[in-house]
Amino acid sequence: MEPAGGAPRESARAEALLGELEARVQEVVRASSWWERHGVDCAILALSLLALPPGFLCLRSDSPLVFALGITILGVCHYTLTVKGSHLATHGALTESRGWSKVWTLFFVEVCTSFTAEYAKYGHVKMHHGYTNVLGLGDSSTWRLPCLNRYVYMFLAPLLIPIITPLVAVERLREVELRTALRTLGLISLGLYSQYWLLLNVSGFQSPSSALACMLITRSLLAHPYLHVNIFQHIGLPMFSPDKKPRRIHMMSLGVLNLPRLPVLDWAFGHSLISCHVEHHLFPRLSDNMCLKVKPVVSQFLHEKQLPYNEDSYLARFWLFLQRYEEFMVQTPPITELVGLQ
C-alpha cells in the first residue's frame, strides 16, 4: 500500500520537475533570435508557396521525368503547407501576434488542408494535447478503424485521406454557428477550386477528370507516412484512465515517442511531428526549429531524472504494428496505472 500523503508528495515532485524543465527550456528560448523562434519555419512555408508555380508548370511538360517532378513538387508542398503549416498555426507557433495567428490558422487549416479550424483546435490542441493517451479523450482513437484488416489499413486506407478530410470537416460544421460554417465552406471551396482551376488553366489538363485525378495523386503523395506517424508515436505506448491520469511530465514522457531524423518528413511534417514529438508535447507552442533546438535539453533532463524518453525507428514501428495490429488497432488497449504518480 502507498503511505498516507504519498500521492500529494509525488504530485508536488512532478510539478517541481516540470517547473525545472520549463525553466531550462525558457532559458534557451530567451537566448534565441526571432529567426530561430519563427523565421526558419516561416521561410520553409514561404519556399513551399513559391515552389507551387514551377510545380504547376512542370505538369505541362510531355517529358515523363519533368511531369513526375511536378507531381513531387506539388505533393511535397501540399504536405508542407497542410501538415507543417496547419500544425504550427493551430498551436500559435508561427507568430506571437494573436491576430496574425488567427489568419494563418484559417489559411493553412481551411484553405490548404480543407478542414475546420475550430475542430482542429478542439480535437488536437484541447483534447489530444490536454489528455495525451487518456482513453476516450486524447488517445488517438480517431485513427483506429477496427473494420479494416492490417494490410488494407496500412497500405490502402491512407489513399482516402484527401477525400475523407473535407467530408469530415463538413460533418463537423453541424456543431458550429452558421456564420462560422459558411466561412469554413467558403475557404475550403476556395482551396479546392484554386488547385483544380490551376491544373486546367496553367498545367493544361484537358478534362475535369484528369485534373481531379492529379489532385488526388498530389494530395496522397505522403499520405502513408502521415497516417503511420500519427499512430506510431502514441498507440502501443501506456494508456491512462481519465480518473487516474498521471501528472503532465509523466504523461508526456510515457505516452509520446520520437522517430529519428527523416529529411523529407522533417521538411514536410516538421520536427515537432517526427524527431521532436516528446518536446512538442511538453512545449506545444514552440516552433519546429525551436523543438529541435531544445531537444538536447529535454533529452538530457529526462535521462538525468530517470524518466522515460521513448525513441524508435520508422521501420521498427511499422513492423511492430503489422505484427501486433489486432492488439494495437482493434482491441481496447489496457490501462496503465502508475501508483503514486496520479
Curated annotation (Swiss-Prot):
Motif (Histidine box-2): 124-128
Subcellular location: Membrane
Pathway note: Lipid metabolism; fatty acid metabolism
Cross-referenced InterPro entries: FA_desaturase_dom, Fatty_acid_desaturase
Source organism superkingdom: Eukaryota
Histidine box-1, short sequence motif: residues: 87-91
Membrane-spanning parts: 39-59, 63-83, 151-171, 185-205
GO-annotated cellular components: membrane
Enzyme class: oxidoreductase
UniProt EC number: 1.14.19.-
GO molecular function, one term: oxidoreductase activity, acting on paired donors, with oxidation of a pair of donors resulting in the reduction of molecular oxygen to two molecules of water
Keywords annotated in UniProt: Fatty acid biosynthesis, Fatty acid metabolism, Lipid biosynthesis, Lipid metabolism, Membrane, Oxidoreductase, Transmembrane, Transmembrane helix
UniProt GO BP: fatty acid biosynthetic process; lipid metabolic process
Membrane topology: Multi-pass membrane protein
Principal subcellular localization: membrane
Motif window: Histidine box-3: 277-281
Family membership: Belongs to the fatty acid desaturase type 1 family.
Listed name of the protein: Fatty acid desaturase 6
Organism for this UniProt entry: Bos taurus
